[in-house]
Regions:
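Catalytic Walker B motif of ABC-type/P-loop ATPase nucleotide-binding domains
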Residues: 159-163
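A short, surface-exposed alpha-helical micro-motif characterized by mixed small hydrophobic
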Residues: 200-202
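ABC ATPase "signature
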Residues: 218-219
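Hydrophobic anchor residue at the start of the ABC signature
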Residues: 148
Length: 252
């Protein structure tokens, strides 16, 4: 449930161009504390580009990003401190152990006192026994778990996860979803990009559906059902909305 009057994540008029290609165009949405929002869309819809702009890995061509009440352009350190980000493809430091990764993240965010919490997170994700393993020796699934664990070390106000469930075993996926719900219930804003529509339907309080760089629909499941007459499930509505979306015009 949405418990905050002021959104903790605000995207306003976001554009991102790569040469003549407009990957994201005039994107505006917000995520308030106490809700999980799913960012959905087919391949090439602009989801990852949007999340990378939020995480400061890409600089927007135009528009504004505010995280935890801080403008990412004018107050970048404060904005980044409020954010926990998990990329689509985890890339841990090869020569750091699992435990050293968490200690590094805790130090970077001034959360050295949270190592008891870090231990609990590793145990929930079945990484505690691997805490001495180097990043280079981890499997793909373990790298994904490590990236997720690092996101929970400091008490972020905004969580931004790009396809976090890919590569996780069933127990790991279940634990991560429960941890996201717990973060929401504690008042955080959670944005999750996923292609797993059945998971999004069960996990998310709202969804934002993108296609060709723009939002084509957003709302709760009840709101989508009221506006989208085609389809009883999120998957059916998603396919209908993305098929009807206008073709993107590449600027000359």
């Amino acid at each position: 449930m949405n418990t905050a009057e002021t959104p903790l994540l605000e995207i306003a008029g976001l554009f991102k161009r790569f040469g003549r290609i407009e990957a994201v165009r005039d994107l505006t949405f917000s995520v308030s504390g106490g809700e999980i929002v799913g960012l959905l869309g087919p391949n090439g819809a602009g989801k990852t580009t949007t999340i990378r702009c939020i995480a400061s890995l890409l600089r927007p061509t135009a528009g504004r990003v505010r995280i935890g009440g801080f403008d990412l352009e004018t107050s970048p350190e404060d904005a980044k401190r409020a954010l926990a980000y998990v990329p689509e493809v985890p890339n841990p430091y090869e020569m750091l152990t699992v435990w050293e990764h968490l200690r590094f993240i805790a130090a970077a965010y001034g959360a050295e006192g949270e190592m008891v919490r870090a231990e609990a997170v590793l145990k929930r994700l079945d990484l505690w026994e691997k805490r001495g393993e180097l990043g280079a020796n981890l499997s793909k699934g373990m790298k994904q778990k490590l990236a997720c664990a690092c996101a929970f070390v400091h008490r972020a106000r905004v969580f931004c996860f790009d396809e976090p469930l890919i590569g996780l075993d069933p127990k790991g996926a279940r634990e991560l979803k429960e941890m996201l719900r717990e973060s929401r219930d504690a008042g955080a804003a959670v944005l999750v990009s996923t292609h797993m529509l059945d998971t999004a339907e069960r996990l998310c309080d709202r969804v934002i559906i993108m296609d060709r760089g723009a939002v084509v629909e957003q709302g709760t499941m009840d709101e989508l059902h009221a506006r989208v007459t085609m389809g009883a499930t999120l998957e059916e509505m998603f396919l209908h909305l993305t098929e009807r979306a206008p073709q993107e015009q590449v600027p000359p």
